[in-house]
């Protein structure tokens, strides 16, 4: 197994241009596919999850051209639904942002489509989405365990009508349903059961749909109306914002060991909720400065916070490791959906924080972290989870440094993360 040793870092300073957002990249690729016209996507993320989406689209007959560095994609929309005369089997790795939307999109046309993935994907739930699609007439069969991939879609189109979908596990299910609703055979009225998690991710979806000419009526996140007769029209160009979750590591670095760290590609005009991570750092005592498309974090003594972070679940992970450098006990609440991500992130985070000496209480949907008097060095397991690797890079700011096991797992969203991280040192 590959290991990366991060030696103690005394101070960080510098500027990082954040790679494109994973959430926006895969949503935009699918909408561009369903749209009429050619779309040029710039600052597209070049990572495993996006490659899985692109490979699947190519297999389904979608034509696109990638720049040499894979960050500009010119894609010819099919102007409607995806159909296939022959049975197709698509491998989607561990990319939830490809599996969920494609599962929904492939019900719209005609054909037989089988969706598979890595072993961890077979443990990540999709039942809430499938239940909703079945209410609109979709024929979807589980191939192993009910409620989980792999699955086969026998597509004949999607009916309009009223549909209920659970919102308390993952917002990706609602996102997938919203994106396909305009191409159903009638108007779609979506009722959300339970409290909707990660609302800002739904805002991203609706904003992108609007860019492609489709209007969603949002009734306070409890009901969504998509009127029949709409279609996606390419806006010509789509700029993919920097990934706000990826920005969180550099902002935390600035807060803990700044110096001054500036991230560009996200800022006050961002459509991503995860930029609110900077507000949490500010509550902890960091000096934060906002621009339209940048955020600056400067170092300052940090104190613990006790907050509901359901609205920023991915970026909240960075608070868990930043908490090791804050005075007092930090509590991160309402984060049950950490458990259904690339790994069970609540269990993984608790395990690895204890390795470095933290006192940790792991609840069903919260984590309580008290830093040790002295942080211990350790070998951090990353569970094939990109965010675990990036979060624990913060331990380079301890006097003893840290060792990261399987550092290349960052390829899911940020292949050159550790190179960029190293550029801030000195």
UniProtKB/Swiss-Prot annotation:
Catalyzes the transfer of the enolpyruvyl moiety of phosphoenolpyruvate (PEP) to the 5-hydroxyl of shikimate-3-phosphate (S3P) to produce enolpyruvyl shikimate-3-phosphate and inorganic phosphate. The active site is at residue 314. One of its GO terms (cellular component) is cytoplasm. It catalyses: 3-phosphoshikimate + phosphoenolpyruvate = 5-O-(1-carboxyvinyl)-3-phosphoshikimate + phosphate. Pathway: Metabolic intermediate biosynthesis; chorismate biosynthesis; chorismate from D-erythrose 4-phosphate and phosphoenolpyruvate: step 6/7. One of its GO terms (biological process) is aromatic amino acid family biosynthetic process. Phosphoenolpyruvate binds at residues 22, 96, 124, 172, 345, 387, 412. Keywords: Amino-acid biosynthesis, Aromatic amino acid biosynthesis, Cytoplasm, Transferase. 3-phosphoshikimate binds at residues 22-23, 27, 170-172, 198, 314, 337, 341. InterPro entries: Enolpyruvate_Tfrase_dom (IPR001986), Enolpyruvate_Tfrase_sf (IPR036968), EPSP_synthase (IPR006264), EPSP_synthase_CS (IPR023193), RNA3'P_cycl/enolpyr_Trfase_a/b (IPR013792). NCBIfam families: aroA. Pfam families: EPSP_synthase. The gene is aroA. It is found in: Cytoplasm. Its EC number is 2.5.1.19. It is an enzyme of class 2 (transferase). CDD domains: EPSP_synthase (cd01556). Monomer. GO terms for molecular function: 3-phosphoshikimate 1-carboxyvinyltransferase activity. It comes from the Bacteria. This is 3-phosphoshikimate 1-carboxyvinyltransferase.
């Amino acid at each position: 197994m590959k290991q990366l040793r991060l030696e103690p870092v005394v101070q960080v300073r510098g500027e990082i241009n954040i790679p494109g957002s994973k959430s926006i990249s895969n949503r935009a690729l699918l909408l561009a596919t369903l749209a009429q016209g050619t779309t040029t996507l710039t600052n597209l993320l070049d990572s495993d999850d996006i490659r899985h989406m692109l490979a699947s689209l190519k297999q389904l007959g979608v034509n696109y051209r990638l720049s040499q560095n894979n960050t500009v994609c010119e894609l010819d929309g099919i102007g409607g639904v995806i159909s296939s005369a022959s049975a197709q089997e698509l491998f989607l790795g561990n990319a939830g942002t490809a599996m969920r939307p494609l599962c929904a999109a492939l019900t719209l046309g005609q054909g037989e489509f089988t969706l598979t993935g890595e072993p961890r994907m077979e443990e990540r739930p999709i039942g809430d989405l499938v239940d909703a699609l079945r209410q609109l007439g979709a024929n979807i069969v589980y191939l192993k365990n009910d409620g989980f991939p792999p699955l086969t879609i026998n597509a004949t189109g999607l009916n309009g009508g009223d549909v209920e979908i659970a919102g308390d596990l993952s917002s990706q299910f609602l996102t997938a349903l919203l994106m396909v609703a305009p191409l159903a055979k009638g108007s779609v009225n979506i009722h959300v059961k339970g409290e909707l998690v990660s609302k800002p991710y739904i805002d991203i979806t609706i904003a992108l749909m609007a860019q492609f000419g489709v209007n969603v009526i949002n009734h306070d996140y409890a009901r969504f109306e998509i009127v029949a007769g709409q279609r996606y029209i390419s806006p010509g160009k789509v700029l993919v914002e920097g990934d706000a979750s990826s920005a969180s590591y550099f902002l935390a670095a600035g807060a803990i060991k700044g110096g001054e760290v500036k991230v560009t590609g996200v800022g006050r005009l961002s459509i991503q909720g995860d930029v609110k991570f900077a507000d949490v750092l500010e509550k902890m005592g960091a000096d934060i400065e906002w621009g339209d498309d940048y955020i600056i974090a400067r170092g300052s003594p940090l104190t613990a916070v006790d907050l509901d972070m359901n609205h920023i679940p991915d970026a909240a992970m960075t608070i868990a490791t930043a908490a090791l450098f804050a005075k007092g006990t930090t509590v991160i609440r309402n984060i049950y959906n950490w458990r259904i991500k690339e790994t069970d992130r609540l269990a993984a985070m608790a395990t690895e924080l204890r390795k470095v000496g933290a006192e940790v209480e792991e609840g069903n949907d919260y984590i309580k972290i008290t830093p040790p008097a002295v942080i211990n060095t350790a070998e951090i397991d990353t569970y094939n989870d990109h965010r675990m690797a990036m979060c624990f890079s913060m331990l380079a700011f301890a006097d003893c440094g840290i060792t990261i096991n399987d550092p290349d797992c960052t390829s899911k969203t940020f292949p050159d993360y550790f190179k960029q991280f190293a550029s801030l040192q000195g």
